[in-house]
């Protein structure tokens, strides 16, 4: 995860807005829960956040977004059983959800090359990950999605990815998004 081209594509680094997000998490009544989710893994040696070295900017940013989701929609992340992530970066969000619910069914749609990076990161963190019938399934073919997705107690995640793809690919996912609970 320390290669320059990976850093440019997948990391928010030591930005000051991350400090604002971290401070919001610290003020949250669930801080002790979020604090556990923030603990960074050693796999890939992610760049640690300079003002909170037990985590990275990415992990703080993801956990902050999840706290906003919980608070805004009044949902419990632990009750989500199925997740479809459109564009999974190196696998950070999937790793966080593995710590939220170890029985989660998680699907990541991405390019094959990025799926390989996700495979390495998640496998090195001890997760059941693969391209066929795993708890963490990696998908790079749109035609295979409907066979693999369970929409009950589910969540569709797309942090930046929907804005980064061609409109025709994005349009393919619009009908899927509305089916998630």
Give the positions of each predicted feature:
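Conserved class I S-adenosyl-L-methionine
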Residues: 78-89
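Conserved Class I S-adenosyl-L-methionine-dependent methyltransferase catalytic core
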Residues: 1-77
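A short SAM/SAH-binding and catalytic strip from SAM-dependent methyltransferases
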Residues: 154-168
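S-adenosyl-L-methionine
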Residues: 121-150
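Class I SAM-dependent methyltransferase SAM/SAH-binding core
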Residues: 103-132
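A short, conserved alpha-helix within the catalytic core of class I
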Residues: 165-177
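Conserved SAM-binding loop of SAM-dependent methyltransferases across substrates and taxa
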Residues: 90-101
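Conserved beta-strand signature within the Rossmann-like core of class I S-adenosyl-L-methionine
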Residues: 180-181
């Amino acid at each position: 995860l320390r290669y320059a081209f990976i850093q440019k594509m997948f990391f928010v680094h030591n930005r000051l807005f991350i400090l604002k997000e971290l401070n919001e998490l610290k003020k949250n009544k669930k801080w002790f829960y979020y604090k556990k989710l923030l603990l960074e893994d050693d796999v890939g040696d992610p760049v640690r956040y300079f003002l909170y070295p037990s985590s990275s900017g990415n992990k703080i940013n993801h956990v902050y977004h999840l706290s906003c989701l919980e608070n805004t929609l009044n949902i419990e992340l632990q009750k989500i059983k199925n997740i479809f992530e459109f564009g999974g970066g190196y696998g950070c969000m999937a790793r966080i959800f593995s710590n939220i619910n170890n029985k989660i069914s998680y699907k990541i749609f991405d390019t094959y090359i990025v799926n390989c990076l996700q495979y390495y990161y998640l496998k090195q963190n001890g997760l059941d990950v693969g391209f066929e019938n795993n708890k963490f399934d990696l998908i790079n073919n749109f035609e295979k999605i409907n066979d693999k997705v369970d929409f009950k107690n589910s969540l569709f995640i797309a942090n930046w990815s929907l804005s980064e793809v061609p409109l025709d690919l994005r349009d393919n996912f619009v009908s899927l998004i509305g089916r998630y609970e």
